[in-house]
């Protein structure tokens, strides 16, 4: 699952939040 945080940063959701560059 891929979502975006409030700043539009791509965040990978896989048990924990990780920033995806």
From Swiss-Prot:
This is Major outer membrane protein. GO terms for molecular function: porin activity. It is a multi-pass membrane protein. The keyword Transport applies. It is found in: Cell outer membrane. Structural rigidity of the outer membrane of elementary bodies and porin forming, permitting diffusion of solutes through the intracellular reticulate body membrane. Disulfide bond interactions within and between MOMP molecules and other components form high molecular-weight oligomers. Keywords: Cell outer membrane, Disulfide bond, Ion transport, Membrane, Porin, Transmembrane, Transmembrane beta strand, Transport. One of its GO terms (biological process) is monoatomic ion transport. The lineage of its organism: Bacteria, Pseudomonadati, Pseudomonadota, Gammaproteobacteria, Pasteurellales. It comes from Actinobacillus suis. GO terms for cellular component: cell outer membrane; pore complex.
